A protein has these predicted regions:
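Short S/T/G/P-rich N-terminal loop/turn motif that feeds into the first structured element of a domain
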Residues: 1-32, 39, 44-48, 81-86
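Short hydrophobic/aromatic beta-strand micro-patches
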Residues: 9, 53-55
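An amphipathic, aromatic/His-enriched active-site/gating alpha helix that lines ligand/cofactor pockets
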Residues: 31-34, 55-86
């Protein structure tokens, strides 16, 4: 699976960013999504946004999964983790 960074669009006013970040992995599982998973979550309450580190076979697969649980997406970027040399 490929790794992605997902930046949400501004969440609706009634959605708490921290709750969204915490619940999104479970929401994907409960929605029966098996081809995408969220591995890390971050929230920015003042901006009303969340950021996810996710894995999926393709960008479109991940976008479809997030749309299924009503997470508004601003961008999805395929990434490769690079560890700095110490």
């Amino acid at each position: 699976m490929k790794k992605f960074i997902v930046n949400s669009a501004i969440l609706p006013g009634n959605v708490d960013p921290k709750a969204c970040a915490m619940e999104a992995p479970k929401m994907l599982k409960n929605a029966g999504v098996k081809n995408a998973k969220i591995t890390s979550c971050y929230c920015c309450g003042p901006e009303g946004r969340v950021v996810f580190v996710a894995e999926a076979e393709a960008r479109e697969t991940l976008l479809t999964a997030l749309n299924r649980i009503n997470v508004p997406v601003a961008s999805i970027m395929e990434t490769e983790e690079v560890k700095p040399k110490m």
